[in-house]
UniProtKB/Swiss-Prot annotation:
It comes from the Bacteria. Pfam families: EcsC. Unknown, does not resemble components of ABC transporters. It comes from Bacillus subtilis (strain 168). This is Protein EcsC. Disulfide bonds: none annotated. InterPro entries: EcsC. The gene is ecsC.
């Protein structure tokens, strides 16, 4: 098998695993986490909602763009994949260091830095997109990244329909109402998973939580880019 065929096989296996229904244990964990979320003060809910709203607005406006500084156009997809893996690890370390600092101060200090934690994750997506050769100065590519973020933290119910939009992006992007998308974006993210971004909330704490969640986001992005590129290549 060629390198591209191996990457396609890996991506398809990931897709099958990703789209499966949550296990009984995962559903139980989600119910427990939901109970925890219900005890979180309304003030924190408001900060989370506003943080996501500002993240979406900044991304759509292009005010938070960051790109990979080196030209990767001459690299093979396999080489880009290895570079992407190293990039994810690098951002994991940054996120973990931030999580350790905020986690030590409890949930109220953590929520104060929540926008920064979101920013780290979006910077990771911008960098990965740039590595794979996509132009993040293009507004539609930035929307694509928001969808990838949304997919990584989507609920079991909305996962398949969202994945379908991403998988058929070249067609779907023509029919998306960007204003409605921006208004509804927050509602489609699984609140349970969103609160897991907060150090000190959920099964993992502080730096560990951020390290794992950045890995989850990075792996989702990496495989989505593989599927997109290989599909476009096959269609040429």
């Amino acid at each position: 098998m060629t390198d591209n065929q191996l990457l396609m096989q890996e991506a398809l296996e990931w897709k099958m695993h990703f789209l499966r229904k949550d296990s009984m244990f995962e559903r139980f964990s989600k119910r427990v986490q939901t109970k925890v979320n219900e005890r979180i003060p309304e003030k924190i809910h408001t900060v989370v909602t506003e943080s996501v709203k500002k993240m979406v607005e900044a991304t759509m406006a292009g005010s938070n763009i960051i790109t990979y500084k080196k030209d990767t156009s001459a690299l093979s997809l396999s080489e880009k994949n290895e570079l992407a893996k190293k990039t994810i690890v690098s951002y994991q370390k940054v996120a973990a260091a931030e999580g350790v600092g905020t986690g030590a101060g409890g949930i109220f200090l953590s929520i104060a830095d929540f926008p920064l934690l979101l920013s780290i994750k979006m910077k990771c997506l911008f960098t990965l997109s740039s590595i794979y050769g996509f132009d993040v100065k293009d507004a539609q590519e930035r929307i694509f990244l928001l969808l990838v973020f949304q997919l990584a933290f989507s609920s079991d119910d909305g996962r398949k329909s969202l994945f379908s939009v991403i998988e058929n992006w070249e067609t779907e992007k023509k029919s998306i109402d960007w204003r409605v998308f921006q208004q509804e974006y927050r509602d489609y993210i699984d609140v349970v998973k969103l609160f897991q971004l907060l150090p000190g909330v959920g099964a993992a704490v502080g730096g560990i939580a951020n390290y794992k969640l950045l890995a989850q986001l990075g792996e989702t992005a990496r495989h989505v880019f593989h599927l997109r590129i290989l599909k476009e290549t096959a269609g040429e």
